[in-house]
Swiss-Prot record:
Top-level taxon of origin: Bacteria
Amino-acid positions noted as binding beta-D-fructose 1,6-bisphosphate in the UniProt annotation, renumbered to this chain: R156, H171
Protein's gene: ldh
Organism: Borreliella afzelii (strain PKo) (Borrelia afzelii)
Record protein name field: L-lactate dehydrogenase
Main location class: cytoplasm
Length: 316
């Protein structure tokens, strides 16, 4: 149950600051945003900068610098803290470093008395979401990761550009790891209400083009990192979307890091991985278990096994 429409952000780096900015300019629900960072001056500077723009907002939001004690009455704690992916690194390369950072963060948040919902955006996000669940001992529906929400947004952008159709009218998901082993649910994809299979049969797109689009989705982060050093605007918007879904009790379907324990064929168990789920004020209302093709199911299992191999190395 929501208490105060209060959000605490832990991590004032590029992703956290982009989320905070997105939340302030498109805010109709959150009353208070508290920013915490190990670099206190950075957090204080972000708070000042955001507050100095209050005159230009349709609805003001109380932005404050804080400490872990401020988590006690928060509805949501968003975590973007941790080491960033560097050029040439995969997200999975960050497991050991960020899992240690998370142990300290989660311990401090839980010690405050926080009993709301965690939203995790730090990479590798599926594993960090699992780590959060284990360290916090929170119910699985109250621990959410950004999952493949950004991958899905990238996919819909590329399809929108290819077909000249608004992204809102493209229904397709990226599932699996937020990373190199992800896959697209092509068999379930619809563009402007029309199944993708019809576009293929009509010769309006080819399987080869679809493969190239997926490669662009997978490589997008590497390209952005190479060009500007980090990705943060798009994922900041994605986090804002998840937070609004919770605060606004939207019951919206989002491709988040969902807890899978036997869905999708029964082979994937005890893992957080990108899959569509219904998000509401309680967190995850339901992880969807829709039918995917045998080929897609094999990719899903492979992606889960890859994540599992890294999780098994973490000492809880």
């Amino acid at each position: 149950m929501l208490k105060s429409n209060k959000v605490v952000l832990i991590g004032a780096g590029g992703v956290g600051s982009s989320f905070a900015y997105a939340l302030t300019i498109d805010n109709s629900l959150v009353h208070e945003l508290v920013i915490i960072d190990v670099n206190e001056d950075k957090a204080k500077g972000e708070v000042m900068d955001l507050n100095h723009g209050q005159m230009f907002l349709k609805k003001n939001i109380n932005v404050l610098f804080g400490t872990y004690k401020d988590c006690v009455n928060a509805d949501i704690v968003v975590i973007t803290a941790g080491l960033n992916q560097k050029p040439g690194e995969t997200r999975l390369d960050l497991v050991g470093k960020n899992s240690k950072i998370f142990k300290d963060i989660i311990t401090n948040v839980v010690s405050s008395g926080f009993d709301g919902i965690f939203v995790i955006a730090s990479n590798p996000v599926d594993i960090m979401t699992y780590v959060t669940m284990k360290y916090s001992k929170f119910p699985i529906h109250k621990v959410i990761g950004t999952g493949t929400i950004l991958d899905t947004s990238r996919l819909r952008y590329f399809l929108s550009d290819r077909f000249n159709v608004n992204t809102q009218n493209i229904h397709s998901y990226v599932m699996g790891e937020h990373g190199d082993s992800s896959f697209v649910t092509w068999d379930e994809t619809k563009i402007a209400m029309k199944p993708l299979s019809e576009y293929l049969s009509e010769g309006k797109i080819t399987e080869l083009e679809l493969d190239e689009i997926h490669k662009k989705v997978v490589n997008a982060a590497y390209e952005v990192i190479k060009l500007k050093g980090a990705t943060y605007y798009a994922i900041g918007l994605g986090i804002k979307n998840i937070v609004n879904a919770i605060i606004g009790d939207q019951n919206i379907i989002l491709p988040i890091s969902s807890y899978i324990n036997g869905q999708y064929g029964g082979l994937i168990k005890d893992i957080y991985i990108g899959a569509p789920a219904i998000v509401c004020k309680e967190g995850v209302k339901e992880v969807l278990n829709f039918k995917i093709s045998p080929k897609e199911l094999e990719k899903f299992n492979n992606s889960a096994n890859q994540l599992k191999s890294y999780i098994d190395k973490i000492e809880f």
